[in-house]
Amino acid sequence: MTSPHVHIGEILARNARLYPDSVALVERTPAEKKRSEITWKQFDDQVNRFANVLIHKGIKKEDKVVHLMMNSIDWLIAYFGIIRTGAWAVPLNFRFTGTEIEYCSSVAEPKCFVFSQEFIDRVDGIRNDLPTVKDFIAVGREIPKYAESFEKLLEK
């Protein structure tokens, strides 16, 4: 039985140790007739890589990182990577307008902002109004000039 005081990130690491080659996550994109899956070990490795990226950027315990993405495997990798650093993940609702994103981000005072390509227009409109954000990380094929590619950062 799991202790009631185990961090959720430790559950992921434990599953990677116990079931390294078992499928952890499956993502289906019916419109593209695409199916992706990753094992527990792959999931844990990618979470570690993203956590290390954030740490290298200066993110530390109790910092805040805004997380604005559509549901996907990358959403989970980013979320777990954020919390593995000890920082607070600040997930925002995908339905938020630019004004709502700016308001919530201003209240949170994040140091980093992770978003998927579906939100480029909304982030473009507010990014200059977020003085605490030092790094923007974009997920997907379209990466604006002011952001770094999530995928490329994971490759390093």
Task: Annotate each PLM feature.
Residues 5, 68, 113-116:
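Active-site-adjacent beta-strand anchor residues
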